Amino acid sequence: MGGERVAVAGLSYAQLLASARAAAGALVEQGVRPGGRVALALAPGPEFVAALHGCFLAGAIAVPIDLRLGKGERVAREQEAVLIVQEPLRGPPLEDAVALRLEDVAVGMYTSGSSAAPRPVPLTHGNWLASALASAAALGLDPGEVWLCPLPLVHVGGLSILIRSAIYATTAIVDPRFEAEAVAAALSDRKQRITMVSLVPTMLARVLEAGLEHPPTLRWVLLGGGPIPPALLERAQRAGVPVAPTYGMTEACSQIATRGWPLPGVDVRIAPDDEILVRGPNVSAEALAPDGWLHTGDLGRFDGRGRLEITGRKSEVIVSGGENVAPAEVEAVLLEHPAVADACVFSRPDREWGESVVAAVVLREGASLEEGELRAHCAGRLAAFKVPKAVELVRSLPRSETGKLMRSRLS
């Protein structure tokens, strides 16, 4: 490992290894055996990181638990665990780590649940290693990498930063509670030498509003977790903020494509119905269909240069009068209006057309806008059947903790 180099949460790699061995010893002492599921109900920070790597040393399967869940949801996720960890793990250091195989499950990772009930996905040590190597090949790797993580560690986008950084022997900074001003300040601070940060679109928008410009050491903002409005990318470009739009999902151990290009070693194809299909060493074997591909449920296409474009979700397509409408396309047009801060497009039953297109819109502070103005804005940029039949002005939109729109709460 990296010895005295900082690993995460102020711990050097030597200190992290010592803490992980103590955590592994505590797990073994409490009867955890290789392959046993261990629920990690810990706040993000050094104790969580030590417990995670302790699970790996003991050959156990780590299951990160979201502490914000209700009692019933937590019980459902913890019921198969042989141990629920709620306090720091400290025991006699485990001297001999369990010999692991690439096909051994490392983490039971729950999906975000934005479009369906959250479900556990088994991700192996081989999945994590393949993902880390492919990501480094796509984005490059700075020996002095410092990766800021404001994403929840209970989701794959956040946890992947911890695991990749350990594989690279580089530094991760865990930011347990996202605050736009604090993130903007950290990225602007040359002394912190932050080279990478992972954000979702709503986070980036807030960081830019907080005044981030020309961060001195930043190589990339890895931006994913939902549709990325072109207007947001333009704002980032004007501010001198380097953005790598990223497409991924839990079943693929986070990244599938970055800046439109599939990661090295990852195969992507478009099915006849425009669904994106994926396979590769980063994909959970349990997520593969009988045809050997991960059917993502996302819709997409390749542009003239061979770059992957995401056009929407199969389950979210609105069928109005026999025409298909992708909500993300309409949202992107709405967000081009200077008075619009956020937008969500969804469907409502329509006796004549089957479904009608409806938009919920959040205006920027101090802005005013009539429904007719916004519909006229869309009419000049979209086919008539895609223009929202109704526009509702709201104060906020329902989003998951990773920034994904929860459309079902509006429709």
Task: Give the location of each predicted region.
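Gly/Ser/Thr-rich phosphate-binding loop
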Residues: 194-199, 203-259, 267-269
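Conserved AMP-binding/adenylate-forming core of the ANL superfamily
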Residues: 4-32, 36-39, 43-45, 72-74, ...
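Short beta-strand->loop structural element characteristic of the AMP-binding/adenylate-forming
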Residues: 8, 39-41, 48, 52, ...
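Conserved pre-ATP/AMP-binding loop-to-beta segment of ANL
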Residues: 3-6, 92-110, 117, 126, ...
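AMP-binding/adenylate-forming catalytic core of the ANL superfamily
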Residues: 280, 299-386, 396-398, 403, ...
